[in-house]
Amino acid sequence: SFGTAGLRGTLGAGTNRMNVYTVGRATQGFADYLNAHFENPSVAIARDSRNNGELFVRTAAAIFAANGVHAYVYPRISPVPTLSWAVRDLGCSGGVCVTASHNPAAYNGYKAYASDGCQITSEAAAAISAAIESTDIFSGVKSVDFDAALAKGDVTWIDDAVLERYYGAVLSKSVSNLSADEVAKAPLKLVYSPLNGTGLVPVTTVLERAGVTDITVVPEQRDPDGDFPTCPYPNPEIREAMQKG
């Protein structure tokens, strides 16, 4: 069922699983909601490293485009905070992140965000859920070809300037008055693991620009991998997830 956290479930066939049909139906319902509440609506879309993420993003973007909702899409994997930033930075009506957060590898999900970049409210979730329930999963979903929508301009890649503004905003919130050069002189050593997710580039970029350069990244968990081979349950609150670090 669709709630404030959107959808989440195991990958597979069926209406209670994550697949192109359930993603498509959810997107149609979200598009109907956005069209009912905004003039010329738009969305930002991102995905993490989970399996089928790119497929679900292309599916969602094509459906939004078919419904007159302009889709701004991150061309590479991106963590949730960068999606929230893009919604606000680009002035979007909403956002979607294809992610199952810290669930095991068999899962994926579809999180919806409001125009403020925050998770949708219970009222919005109820309205979107009603729109989804009224949509036939096979015949009620409008779609176009993703590449055709991209060529037409109904889908737009999010460029690196958006991420650069995000990095700048994060760095501006530093509680330290030290410059990056001063920080670099301090004996700071840090161990970091992205847990095979999306954090490597944004986390190390911000840390290095802040002056923290002695960063050891756990090699087995450095690269994005939807199978999470060294960390079946990628939740940093679970002790086992941090053992290699």
Q: Which residues are covered by each model-predicted region?
A:
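Gly/Ser/Thr-enriched, mixed-charge loops and adjacent short helices
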Residues: N108-A241
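N-terminal small/polar loop signature for handling phosphorylated ligands or for N-terminal nucleophile
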Residues: A44-Y107, V206-G245
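Short, glycine-/Ser/Thr-/acidic-enriched flexible segments
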Residues: L7-G9, G14-N16, R50, S78-P79, ...
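Alpha-helix capping at helix-to-loop junctions
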Residues: A36, D89, S134-F138
